[in-house]
Amino acid sequence: RSFSYNEVGCAIKGNIIRIAKNKYKFFKSREVEGKIKVLTVKRDACGDFYVYLACETPGVKIEPRLGKSIGFDFGLKGKMLVAPNKEDDVVAPSFFKKKQKAIAKASREFSTKRPHSNNRRRAQLSLARLYRKVTNQRKAYHWQLARELCQKYAVICFEDLNMERMHRGYGKKVSDYGFSEFLRILEYVAPQFGTRVVKVDRFYPSSQLCCECSYQNPRVKDLSVREWVCPSCKTHHDRDRNAAQNILDEGLRILSA
């Protein structure tokens, strides 16, 4: 459902694109910067065509900047990202959840249509458009959030979690937040702002360590333990906030090593 051309086989002038010997009108979402190296045309499940351009631009190196640092723990209880301080939390819209009833209805209508009929094709198209809307909304939010975080922080620390394992355990919630896609976008955006993204090893016991005295509490391995009191220094911890603080501390240690 896609094909590519190198710089010889394509050209763009205004809103006209030449692919091989054919010319097509297209909607230009933004101006093309640099020299086109590869052009890819993709067709989505709705039957619409999209043009993706890989361009060569003069390299401008942005040095890492100084500024505020933050550590985030991935949340599943109504918050996408949990920070050491409540005011820095990120509450993400659940785009799939909002469209779930409409998607379920469209799925039922699709399943009742006779195979290979026009009605079935129309029902399939309606369902595909709903899924595409959810995907586009989530992606737009991820880009916006990545830019906001990179403008605000010079260092952003995350735990390098096994997303496939999380998906098996939490399913729709992990898919709806799109953690993996967000991290990919964040790592792409960060260098443009001089922001550094640091990943802490997934086996680092961020939830079990007391962020005040570094006491390790093995009882916190149980995910049902949401709050706990450190037996050593008696500090009361919220599981996710304590983990976020430990992720920040470990990320800064990695950065300075």
Across the structure, where does each feature detected by a protein language model lie?
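Acidic carboxylate diad motif detector
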Residues: 1-42
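Positively charged, helix-rich recognition surfaces that bind polyanionic ligands
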Residues: 32-40, 45-257
